[in-house]
From Swiss-Prot:
This is ETS-like protein pointed. Residues 303-412, 430-521, 545-571 are annotated as: Disordered. The keyword Phosphoprotein applies. Residues 320-329, 552-561 have a biased composition (Polar residues). Residues 466-484, 505-517 have a biased composition (Gly residues). SMART domains: ETS, SAM_PNT. Disruption phenotype: Embryonic lethal showing loss of photoreceptors. In larvae, RNAi-mediated knockdown results in a transformation of type II neuroblasts into type I neuroblasts, elimination of intermediary neuronal progenitors (INP) and generation of extra type II neuroblasts; in the ventral nerve cord, results in increased numbers of type I neuroblasts. Simultaneous RNAi-mediated knockdown of the zinc-finger transcriptional repressor erm, the transcriptional repressor E(spl)mdelta-HLH or the transcriptional repressor dpn restore normal neuroblast numbers. Residues 337-363, 372-412 have a biased composition (Low complexity). ETS transcription factor with a prominent role during development of the eye and the nervous system. Required for glial-neuronal cell interactions at the ventral midline which are necessary for the proper elaboration of commissures in the embryonic CNS. GO terms for cellular component: nucleus. The lineage of its organism: Eukaryota, Metazoa, Ecdysozoa, Arthropoda, Hexapoda.
Length: 718
């Protein structure tokens, strides 16, 4: 066996060798040193042989080793020779020569082994049982499946869960006829609501004593902090959250009510509550037999008790009537905070002396009938004596009666906005409705007594046209009015809508009986929806004299100077079928309803209810507007090259600063079903007049282009 001696830095203690002794000590104890060295070398050799036996091979030095290898005598024999030699000093020197050498194991001869430490597997731990495993399965079945568990991991918000839990209150509201607005609750309603919440949410510790003799208004006015102070912990949060949700539901804008037709009104009319109703009349003691007919025609879902309403929210009508252009106060200005819409609703009432019924129907008659009677008698009279202004109008005799201001038709506060939406829905589904006797109310049909004439309540006229703006014609059908869906585009309280529509009832009938509109044009006579909205809209401002506008403030903007009243839309033609006078007037003056002209171009200056199609036609005939709207040269087809500019001008015209193309396009889409304007397929912002516009204006598109020196630029439209 051979051992390889490598690297010369072998320490003296590597093989537990004793440290080198001084020469004097070594000479004195040579035998002891020899015996000790021999003992340690024998022990080291024995351990090396055991290590070789384990590894199965000897440690051999490589051939390239530069170290001095030991020859035939092994290291054991050399070390043993030290003990047997007599020269002790030579033995010590030999040990000193070799003490710095170090024995190492060559890496190429040592087998490497991977030593594994015992570890737990990554997924070896057993999961703890979840709460769902511990919980009672039978108890979990009692949780409503519609409500998600109130855990942090749920995807539903807590507010949505609360709304779902409050859904049962809607049934209680309908069952007990409770108003949705908590501010209108009586003391009984408050206690009923608290008892419902106590049973619904198992509020055992709920104390109702602080809420006795407390109305809904007072409860809401407490505020959240005071409300929580008189309710148990956590219970008050639930109750206040419900109150907050109910109030927010009642404060939604009107556009959510009228099926998405969001007209921008100056009022903040709401679904529920007399605080926000468009028209609320005081509750008089006069008997009225028309309440049953109103309730039978209108949805009972919108009927609330008048006794629960706060009388301070009512606005009484003016106790005098308008005879011609009355220069006195025409609407109640006592309450300066009254919104313009409510001021407009304060119109005088009319008692139909020729009606079949004997009861007082003052507020059932629209203000337009009274105004029509007065204007037909004497439009310049300022006499306020109502008994001296009896006149005949198309077979019906009506007498203005301001002394009996019997606004007793509103014993139940009816949400007329929602009611009009119901009429709108039903009338849309009636095919072939005809516009019979728009303004005359004659021909044996006592239209004045129609309890569904919503215009008498101050309802915006484009909605009232569905119910009250229609008369009973020869066919017995009801006119749809054709104006409800255009609510975004015809402002209900436009600052430029004036008293120029004075003769709202007389000219439309054109005859004594039969309800004919007096229109000689065959095509337009058969399409009453085309112009039916004029009757409803003109009646809305009939009660205003020329010096007053629906807004007391200055109007937003105007496209031109305000002309005189006789130069306005419908100065002598209000409620007349447009074709009846458009065909009799010249193009410059009568193309768009008696507009004034600027440089030979018809220009509607802002008075009277202009419709969107008329406005577009006006722009198309204005040479200065060709940069944003122009004819394409294909018949009556036109393109909005800059739709935002068109929408901006339309907003200026209708006093709607927030008008944009999205809202304007809704008005254009409304014309699709009425066959007035169609969208050209495959072309962006390109539309076409599909009505008989040529027969209406008496000119072809080419003639209009030549007359007004318009340029037709055929462009590639995408």
């Amino acid at each position: 066996m051979e051992l390889a001696i490598c690297k010369t830095d072998l320490s003296a203690t590597k093989f537990m060798l004793p440290p080198a002794l001084p020469s004097s000590a070594a000479i004195g104890s040579s035998s002891a040193v020899a015996s000790t060295a021999s003992h340690f070398l024998d022990k080291a050799a024995h351990e090396l042989f055991q290590l070789n036996a384990i590894n199965g091979h000897l440690f051999k030095s490589p051939a390239s080793s530069h170290l001095n290898s030991v020859g035939s005598p092994s290291i054991l024999s050399q070390l043993n020779g030290i003990g047997n030699s007599g020269n002790h000093s030579g033995q010590v020197s030999t040990m000193r020569l070799k003490k710095n050498r170090k024995v190492t194991f060559l890496s190429s001869l040592v087998e490497s082994k991977n030593i594994f430490i015992k570890e737990e597997p990554i997924h070896g731990c057993k999961d703890l049982c979840s709460l769902s495993d511990i919980s009672d399965h039978e108890a979990s079945l009692e949780v409503p499946t519609a409500l998600p568990p109130l855990t942090p991991g749920t995807n539903r918000k807590v507010n949505e869960v609360l709304k779902a839990s409050f859904a049962s209150w809607e049934k209680e509201v309908q069952k007990c006829n409770i108003t949705k607005d908590p501010r209108e609750w009586t003391e009984e309603h408050v206690i009923y609501w608290l008892n419902w919440a106590k049973n619904e949410f198992s509020l055992v510790s709920m104390n109702l004593d602080p809420f006795y003799k407390m109305k809904g208004r007072a409860m809401v006015d407490l505020g959240k902090e005071k409300f929580l102070a008189i309710t148990p912990p956590f219970t008050g949060d639930i109750l206040w959250e419900h109150l907050d949700i109910l109030q927010k539901d009642c404060e939604k804008p009107n556009e959510d009510i009228v099926h998405g037709n969001s007209f921008e009104s100056a009022t903040t009319a709401s679904v529920c509550g007399s605080d926000h109703q468009v028209a609320n009349y005081p509750n008089e003691t006069h008997a009225n037999s028309n309440n049953s007919s109103i309730n039978s025609r209108l949805s009972m879902d919108y009927v609330t008790s008048a006794g629960n309403s706060d009388n301070k929210n009512f606005h009484r009508a003016t106790p005098h009537s308008h005879n011609g252009y009355n220069t006195s106060n025409t609407h109640d200005r006592i309450n300066n905070s009254t919104p313009p819409q409510q001021q407009q609703s304060q119109q005088p009432t009319v008692n139909g002396s020729g009606s079949a019924s004997s009861n007082n129907n003052n507020s059932m008659l629209p203000p337009a009938v009274q105004q029509s009677n007065n204007e037909n008698n004497n439009t310049s009279s300022s006499n306020t004596n109502n008994s001296s202004n009896n006149n005949n109008n198309s077979g019906g005799s009506n007498n203005s009666n301001a002394g009996s201001n019997n606004n007793n038709n509103n014993n139940n506060n009816i949400n007329f906005m929602a009611a009009a939406a119901i009429f709108q829905h039903h009338l849309k589904e009636e095919p072939g409705t005809q516009n019979g006797n728009i303004g005359g109310y004659g021909g044996g049909s006592n239209s004045q007594n129609d309890p569904t004439d919503l215009s008498s309540y101050g309802l915006p006229a484009h909605l009232a046209a569905y119910g009250g703006g229609s008369g009973s014609g020869p066919t017995g059908g009801r006119s749809s009015g054709g104006g409800g869906d255009e609510s975004d585009y015809h402002s209900t309280i436009s600052a430029q809508d004036h008293q120029s529509q004075q003769s709202s009832g007389g000219n439309g009938s054109g005859g004594a009986s039969g309800g004919s509109t007096g229109n000689s044009n065959g095509y337009l006579d058969s399409s009453s929806e085309f112009y039916g909205s004029y009757a409803g809209r003109n009646r809305f401002h009939d009660g205003y004299p020329p010096e007053f506008t629906p807004y007391d403030a200055q109007s937003f903007q105007s496209m031109g100077p305000q002309p005189t009243a006789m130069d306005q839309w419908g100065a002598a033609h209000a409620h007349q079928h447009p074709a009846a006078y458009m065909s009799t007037l010249g193009l410059d003056k009568g193309l768009l309803g008696g507009y004034t002209t600027q440089g030979g171009v018809p220009c509607f200056t802002g008075s009277g209810p202009i419709q969107l199609w008329q406005f577009l036609l006006e722009l198309l005939l204005d040479k200065t507007c060709q940069s944003f709207i122009s004819w394409t040269g294909d018949g009556w087809e036109f393109k909005l090259t800059d739709p935002d500019e068109v929408a901006r001008r339309w907003g200026i015209r209708k006093n709607k600063p927030k008008m944009n193309y999205e809202k304007l396009s809704r008005g254009l889409r409304y014309y699709y079903d009425k066959n007035i304007i169609h969208k050209t397929a495959g072309k962006r912002y390109v539309y076409r007049f599909v009505c008989d516009l040529q027969n209406l204006v008496g000119h072809t598109p080419e003639e209009l282009v030549a007359k007004y020196d318009l340029k037709i630029e055929k462009k590639d439209v995408d």
